Swiss-Prot record:
It comes from Chlorobium phaeobacteroides (strain BS1). Gene3D superfamilies: GroES chaperonin. This is Co-chaperonin GroES. It comes from the Bacteria. The gene is groES. The keyword Cytoplasm applies. InterPro entries: Chaperonin_GroES (IPR020818), Chaperonin_GroES_sf (IPR037124), Chaprnonin_Cpn10_CS (IPR018369), GroES-like_sf (IPR011032).
Length: 95
């Protein structure tokens, strides 16, 4: 299935949660922190300004991004988990 976000929305594939600590201990599902970074898999066309001008997106497919802990809406498509969020919910692009 091909996902195409609308307007200034971005679809992000979150990074997998850590399975074990640096010391080698396994983390149970209830103790795992949700990752706050992931890879952009789709972007919308951009936001329309009050003047009617289309503002281009600053993120692109393939960018690794950092976002807030509670950013976006979680969705599952064909067994894969994604986050749909506005571009303004993204804090930074990781190099």
């Amino acid at each position: 299935m091909n996902l195409k976000p609308l307007a200034d929305r971005v679809i992000v594939k979150p990074a997998p949660a850590e399975e074990k600590t640096k010391g080698g201990l396994y983390i149970p599902d209830t103790g795992k922190e949700k990752p706050q970074y992931g890879e952009v898999v789709a972007v919308g066309a951009g936001k329309v300004a009050d003047s009617g001008q289309l503002l281009e997106m600053q993120v692109a497919v393939g960018n690794k991004v950092l976002y807030g802990k509670y950013s976006g809406t979680e969705v599952a498509v064909e067994g894969e988990d994604y986050l749909i969020m506005r571009e303004s919910d993204i804090f930074a692009i990781l190099d």
